[in-house]
Amino acid sequence: MKKSVVIFITAVCLLITGCGDTGSLSKLPSSSFHEDKQKLTIMHIDADNKRFQDFIEETEKKLDMEITVEKCPSNADNRQAKISTILASGDKNIDLISVNDEMISEFKHKGYLEPLEKNVMTEEVRDSFPQKYLESICEENGHIYSVPFQMDIMMFWVNQELLKQAGLDEIKNTGDFDILQKSLKNPDQYAYGDAWENTHVYNSLSQFVNFWGGDYFDWTDPKTKDAARYMKSMLDEKNTSPAQFVDQYEQMEEKFIRGKYGCVFMYTSALGTFLDADVYGKNKIHMAPLPVLHKKKATNIATWQYVLNNASENKDAAVRFLQYAAGYEGSTEYAKIMKSYPARVDVIENEDIDLEGIDMIRKYLREYTLNARPLCENSMGAVSDMEKLFQGYVLGQCEEDSFFEQAQNCINTYY
């Protein structure tokens, strides 16, 4: 009996004192392994998207990291206001934020963001993204302030059923717009649809300037003037609807889906909307080559991007995440899980990437010049002022020469 008690006491002592490394491990709390993981908080436009949640889950495993995702406001104005407040106030709770072109064009001037050219967007990585776009949107004074992760290309979309009704296989030039319009049977149908609401019209105006080979920053250029003249003529000749002055992309897409428009210019992000509405297909709504309006073939692109909050206390973790997201492997995983076009051109060109409409995307990348939109530090002011001038012009409320002069003054003021 005494021998048993001695053995029991000895065993208890061994458990308490431990031996070697066993003692040090026994003193750690059960959650210690999780506490050793790097932590990261991302405010993201796709926080509620199940596919993005899957991407984050896979990334956590890959990087052995604990990532919290917070939602952005869905309204564009509210979103920009909230993110601006977070950055300006030095809020340390958000490390990475997803921003669009309008936001980065403002924030990169403010000192809110961590430069990324030394440890993330190195020269080798940078070469895999559209170069002119990076220079125009992501860079300032020799620094790169963002990592693009999703590409949006301004595509030409057609309703093939309405084209067939007009006896057209495709729209090749301005004459085909007229043919299409004459074939439409209802007074509320138009050959061309657009979104000319005050925060959207600059997309279209700069796009048409691209088609004519003009320069959005030079309103003395005859080609720039011709682009604006043609947009006015489309309204005058009723090839497009006056109702679109109050339409944003959501309303334009809805009308396009309902067969009100024969064709539109819209970003690739609309693909999901058309798929969900079951109207996407080669004999329905689909992406098409650009009409030939000028020998220079160009279109606008935009991206969603990550920026690193300068006030972040988790910069090491943030940089690791950005290195993965900017790299070939991370960008490929993003494309496959999200079913979305990544910002890296080499990943889009990878034949292993099988996304809806990818062949047309590759055609645009190979055959057309990709232009960044005309944005500046005060993009909202520039966009709003140009919209007012353009609306007055196309509605006949100001003379042509006056519009061109005021448009140039607007450019000189903001850019």
Feature roles, as predicted:
Residues 4-6, 13, 19-105, 122-124, ...:
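Conserved N-terminal structural module of periplasmic/extracytoplasmic solute-binding proteins
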Residues 28, 101-154, 178, 186, ...:
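Hinge/lid segment of periplasmic solute-binding proteins
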Residues 34, 285-288, 335-388, 392:
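Long, aromatic- and glycine/proline-rich binding clefts that accommodate carbohydrate-like moieties
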Residues 61-62, 71, 84, 143, ...:
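Extracytoplasmic/periplasmic substrate-recognition and gating elements
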Residues 63-73, 91-93, 167, 233-248, ...:
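A local structural motif
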Residues 72-82, 102, 174-176, 244-257:
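Short helix-initiation/N-cap motifs at beta->coil->alpha
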Residues 95-98, 262-267:
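Paired acidic/hydrophobic, glycine-rich loop segments that form the ligand-binding mouth/hinge
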Residues 181-185, 217-248, 290:
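Glycine-centered hinge/linker elements that transmit conformational signals in sensory
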